[in-house]
UniProtKB/Swiss-Prot annotation:
It comes from Citrus limon (Lemon). Keywords: Chloroplast, Membrane, Plastid, Transferase, Transit peptide, Transmembrane, Transmembrane helix. This is Coumarin 8-geranyltransferase 1, chloroplastic. It catalyses: umbelliferone + (2E)-geranyl diphosphate = 8-geranylumbelliferone + diphosphate; esculetin + (2E)-geranyl diphosphate = 8-geranylesculetin + diphosphate. Its EC number is 2.5.1.138. It is a multi-pass membrane protein. One of its GO terms (cellular component) is chloroplast. GO terms for molecular function: prenyltransferase activity. It is found in: Plastid, Chloroplast membrane. Prenyltransferase specific for geranyl diphosphate as prenyl donor and coumarin as prenyl acceptor. Can use umbelliferone and esculetin as substrates, and with a lower activity, 5,7-dihydroxy-coumarin and 5-methoxy-7-hydroxycoumarin. No activity with 5-hydroxy-7-methoxycoumarin, bergaptol, xanthotoxol, p-coumaric acid, caffeic acid, 2,4-dihydroxycinnamic acid, kaempferol, genistein or homogentisate. No activity with dimethylallyl diphosphate, farnesyl diphosphate or geranylgeranyl diphosphate as prenyl donors.
Length: 407
């Protein structure tokens, strides 16, 4: 039964169906505005008085309405949760991407620092040199057995590791000087700590010597020990050491390692202890030792030109600071011209026609390229002089290819 009451307070009452029959429930309805004012005409009280049957019927109706509303709201809630989860997933993915990118950048930076730390131009020279020397004792394709390749890889690895030791120990000993001369090097720039660099040098040297000992080859073991001792004496700042500050001792170190150890120790190792043949010193080996020794002496002089500023600052008297950059450059270029002239004469005396032709044309070409490159050197620019030094390393690589045509 519906009863209507007029009341200015607009507080409708309803006999709520979920309560007991005969109870009264007051409902507060919102006021509306009409043209800026309250619409009082709609302010009425509504009271609903429910009987027992009416209460049951209304309750079922309300439940049905609630179920209908719930069904209608389910899709919205589902999509709302999905969108929220997607946003959370996107945020999580973005954080993961940032962390992944940051880790990748740090890893790549460290790997690049390690790459620079090994002085790759010298490492390439070692790979080319040892490979070339390993080929000299071969007499036929039948010598290229699996055992030969395995022994070659072991010897090459020991040489590369020792070469890297010499380059890294030099950087560990020259951190302060390199901050002036070569600020881009890993230790000088701070990309690697000195402790890390020292640990790497120890691992490199010990691993190289361990491989040599495992091969049980006296010439190889002897050569690597000499290489280790000279590399240490060249760089380490101890009494009677640090030979790099003396032009004669510095040149002697490079000549012995590149000109003699490379050639004879590794050649005898491959010829006697890998191929099982008696030791025979060949003409190409002698030629390689002579011309590589000359190029090595030149490189020991050239490398001091871009380092002159730092050497002066720390009180080191290099040959470049004594004679002047221009005189040292001229001396190096003339020494290489002389070596290539001798190489052309030796090649012309070869009985192997193809070897004669390749040797003459090859060394003449290298001499011509050297002359062209020397014209472009700017002695006032350290980057230019260092670039020329790296160019001489390329001549070093090229010579190891040409020695095989001298038969």
């Amino acid at each position: 039964m519906l009863q209507m009451h007029s009341n200015s307070s607009f507080s409708p009452k309803c006999y709520y169906p979920l309560q007991h029959a005969g109870c009264v429930k007051t409902l507060q309805l919102p006021l509306t505005k009409v043209h800026g004012g309250l619409n009082r005409s709609e302010s009425k009280n509504y009271a609903i008085k429910c009987t027992q049957s009416d209460s049951f019927y209304s309750t079922n109706k309300i439940r049905n309405n609630e179920n209908s509303s719930s069904r209608n709201c389910k899709p919205f809630n589902k999509y709302r949760v999905a969108v929220t989860l997607q946003q959370q997933d996107c945020a999580s993915n973005n954080e993961d991407d940032i962390n992944s990118t940051s880790f990748r950048d740090v890893l790549l930076k460290k790997l690049h620092a390690l790459y620079v730390f090994t002085r790759p131009f010298a490492m390439i020279g070692t790979i080319v040199g040892i490979t070339s020397i390993a080929i000299l004792p071969l007499q036929s394709f039948a010598d290229l057995t699996p055992k030969y390749f395995m022994e070659f890889l072991k010897a090459l690895l020991s040489a590369v590791l020792m070469n890297n030791y010499v380059g890294t120990v030099n950087q560990v000993a020259d951190v302060e000087i390199d901050k002036v001369n070569k600020p881009g090097l890993p230790l000088a720039s701070g990309d690697l700590s000195v402790g890390t660099g020292l640990a790497i040098t120890l691992i490199l040297s010990l691993t190289s010597l361990a491989i040599a000992l495992s091969l049980q080859s006296p010439p190889l073991i002897f050569g690597l020990i000499v290489w280790f001792l000279l590399g240490t004496a060249y760089s380490v700042d101890l009494p009677f050491l640090r030979w790099k500050t003396n032009p004669f001792l510095a040149g002697m170190c490079m000549v012995i390692v590149f000109g003699l150890v490379y050639q004879f120790s590794f050649f005898i190792h491959f010829q006697k202890y890998v191929l099982g043949r008696p030791v025979v010193i060949t003409r190409p080996l002698i030629f390689a030792a002579a011309i590589i020794s000359t190029i090595s002496a030149v490189m020991s002089l050239l490398k001091d030109i871009p380092d002159e500023d730092g050497d002066k600052q720390f009180g080191y008297q290099s040959i470049s600071s004594k004679l002047g950059k221009e005189n040292v450059l001229r001396l190096c270029v003339y020494a290489l011209f002389f070596a290539y002239g001798v190489a052309v004469i030796v090649g012309a005396s070869s009985s192997f026609q193809l070897g004669k032709l390749v040797s003459i044309i090859g060394h003449s070409t290298l001499a011509f390229l050297l002359w062209l490159r020397a014209q472009t050197v700017d002695l006032s620019n350290n980057a230019s002089t260092f670039s020329f030094y790296l160019f001489v390393w390329k001549l070093f690589y090229g010579e190891y290819l040409l020695i095989h045509f001298l038969r």
